Amino acid sequence: MALWGGRFSKDPDQLVLEYDACIGMGERMAQQDILGSLAHARMLGEQGIIPKEDAEAIVRGLEGILSDVRAGKITWSVDAEDIHMNVETLLTERIGEAGKRLHTGRSRNDQVALDNHMIAMDQCKQTVSLLKGLISLLLETAREHLNTAMPGYTHLQHAQPVTLAHHLMAYVEMFLRDARRFNFTCEMADEMPLGSGALAATTYPLNRERVAELLGFSAITENSLDGVSSRDYFLDYIYAASCCMMHLSRFCEELVLWNSSEFRFVEMDDAFATGSSIMPQKKNPDIAELMRGKTGRVYGDLVALLTVMKGLPLAYNKDMQEDKERFWDAADTLNRSLEVFSAMFASMTFRTDVMRRSALDGFANATDCADYLVRRGVAFRDAHRIVGELVAYCLDAGKTLEELTPEEYRRFDPAFGEDVYGAISLETCVGARSIPGGPAPQAVAAAIASAEKKLAAL
Ligand code: ARG
């Protein structure tokens, strides 16, 4: 008979048991569930709500179950529906009557909320630690490439030259923000919901602050209805995960492009590429592509859980049991992606010579050429048109701006002097963009120093 079977004249249909059970997902919260019960039982004993000896027996029993769970010795059963009732049933089997007092002043509704809060906080910490590893790796690579010129793009067209360090630091900024989002999500989840009961708290004199303290929470939830029916902390996590996957997917897309024969900016390590079953020459950047694809799945988790929660009346509704699969799918996908991305990135080779050649190509210095004329007194709008005409001329003549003769320059505007070549060289173009946030080596070095401080503060 189910733990709640008293008012029923029949056992649940087998179809119901299987459809309703969530022990598959519940297994992953077994440790949090037992830790929560340990704190609850200790508090019940301290408050004299249950006899001290019973509380002690429960604590010993739960500690035994916890160590068996950690040792992988326990198989949970679908018949007991969820992790909460599985643990309680096992406890009573092991310690007898005292086990039946554990659930005093508690409901599975606040119990699952507690487990969820703990899991969300654990996963935030796990994700932040993976992000920190990736950020350190990117910083290390950026430090080596302060002077590695490459084209910067808009519309995927050569725009203005930047450096590889500057490009990588853009991702460092994104991942630093992601890590802060997860830390904020952890802060938001840091409220202890036990004591909310099924929905309307309880008449027992529970010491909620004590439970919070035993479990390391900094606060308790302030409203029992909200305590059992909020899933914001999971949604916050999945949103942060979606954002982080979006950043990874942009990086992956660039690596796919950079690895193509058209770009050849990077060479994927053989260990992180796969071949074709028919085309012997192929070496495909599958891992980067797959990660781009998995981003869609995490977005799906976010929309799915938002939709589960949409329009639900207060307080607990069984719909909410769908939360765990979406949460774990997002957390597992993201954490694994961060791990794989870091390994893939660490094994890649950058072809700095190709990047430099490409930066010299495609008129990435045309803006600097116009700025040169401006310094010579020409209005920017006129300078823009003159250099546009120069570019059209170069395209016809099959030349770059650096290859034009002084006479050719002067044909377009008498303000051009011999010093134009210095003004449009790659080093000048990059080096002159030295304001904070710019690609000049000293500006990027400053950005790296600032990112290191932010990383240390995470
Ligand atoms: N297994 C449920 C969940 O994961 C918690 C139990 C509450 N169920 C209930 N019928 N009151 O959300």
Spell out what each predicted region is.
Residues M1-A201, L206-E213, T274-G275, D286, ...:
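A helix-coil-helix interface module used to build multimeric assemblies
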Residues A41, L62, L138, A241, ...:
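Short alpha-helical scaffolding segments that buttress acidic/His motifs in well-ordered protein cores
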Residues H40-I50, T163-H166, L235-C243, D368-G377:
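Short, well-ordered beta-strand elements within core beta-sheets of diverse protein domains
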Residues G45, V69, A142, F251, ...:
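Hydrophobic residues in alpha-helical segments
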Residues E53-I58, G133-L137, F182, W258-E262, ...:
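Short alpha-helical "patches" and their helix-cap loops
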Residues H117-V128, R143, P151, Q157-G311, ...:
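Charged, flexible cofactor/metal-binding loops and thiol motifs
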Residues I49-I50, I74, F263-R264, A379, ...:
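Conserved hydrophobic residue
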Residues M1-G36, E97-A98, M279-L458:
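Glycine-rich cofactor/substrate-binding loops
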